[in-house]
């Protein structure tokens, strides 16, 4: 099976195009099987799960799919619902909407349903997409909230445990749109082993099974690699003090460009 038709993980910075070209959503639809897709929509992060679930249901229905189901999970007990678990065994794609990432993790983390979704994703059996809050939960370490517009400092970011879909990353969404570079750097200062991803709105980082990450959409994806960081004062200063971070590697990619995790290199678009 060519890479372009294999299941993938799509991490979306929020506010993806839902009306015109719908390129990111079309890519998820295609990677989930196109007209043969069986897609589950998880709107649990939203305060209005029924409304947001129906919105995405309409979008994917218009594209043409084999089956659609909104997994309207509002309490943790539903994470062991036999009907939902059966659907997850049959589906080809799962889409997690935006909202509140803490709410999403509170409902799904360590449930049989989420454990099986993660397992099937890791086995390359299904595609998984998350937008906004649905993107934030992708790592094991998750940015749960914080501020922006300041210098990097530890008080700028609130961390929590995510869903561990791609455990080696930490994600910030609505990135340049909300001036969140300092927030991502603050998170990286205490977790330099992680690859930081700052994803702009209507932009997606698509993780392939060969270790490559392709950028799709209108904005940029910033890759902050601190694995060779030579120094930080994070452990020496107060929570509100400015942070020093030496020898970071920053790559900013646009549509069609690729970052390779293993090679730790960025590649321009092949035309």
Curated annotation (Swiss-Prot):
<dbReference type="InterPro" id="IPR011811">
    <property type="entry name" value="Peptidase_S51_cyanophycinase"/>
</dbReference>
<dbReference type="GO" id="GO:0008241">
    <property type="term" value="F:peptidyl-dipeptidase activity"/>
</dbReference>
<dbReference type="InterPro" id="IPR005320">
    <property type="entry name" value="Peptidase_S51"/>
</dbReference>
<dbReference type="GO" id="GO:0006508">
    <property type="term" value="P:proteolysis"/>
</dbReference>
<dbReference type="InterPro" id="IPR029062">
    <property type="entry name" value="Class_I_gatase-like"/>
</dbReference>
<comment type="subunit">
    <text>Homodimer.</text>
</comment>
<protein>
    <recommendedName>
        <fullName>Cyanophycinase</fullName>
        <ecNumber>3.4.15.6</ecNumber>
    </recommendedName>
</protein>
<dbReference type="GO" id="GO:0042803">
    <property type="term" value="F:protein homodimerization activity"/>
</dbReference>
<keyword id="KW-0645">Protease</keyword>
<feature type="active site" description="Charge relay system">
    <location>
        <position position="174"/>
    </location>
</feature>
<feature type="active site" description="Charge relay system">
    <location>
        <position position="132"/>
    </location>
</feature>
<feature type="active site" description="Charge relay system">
    <location>
        <position position="201"/>
    </location>
</feature>
<keyword id="KW-0378">Hydrolase</keyword>
<dbReference type="GO" id="GO:0008236">
    <property type="term" value="F:serine-type peptidase activity"/>
</dbReference>
<dbReference type="Pfam" id="PF03575">
    <property type="entry name" value="Peptidase_S51"/>
</dbReference>
<keyword id="KW-0720">Serine protease</keyword>
<comment type="similarity">
    <text>Belongs to the peptidase S51 family.</text>
</comment>
<comment type="function">
    <text>Exopeptidase that catalyzes the hydrolytic cleavage of multi-L-arginyl-poly-L-aspartic acid (cyanophycin; a water-insoluble reserve polymer) into aspartate-arginine dipeptides.</text>
</comment>
